[in-house]
């Protein structure tokens, strides 16, 4: 079952468009990096709903996230 956080994240993303972490946080009106990663981003990645553009470097400053 999807959490409300993951649903909100997916609602602000369009398919096949890469987003930065900051862009997604801005769309959601969030300020906490840790809260965003813990509640929104990591659960969506674990469920294979969002993918990283550079999976071998999860902490890359050039990392983008794509709705799949």
What residue ranges belong to the model's regions?
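C-terminal regulatory or interaction extensions
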Residues: 1-68
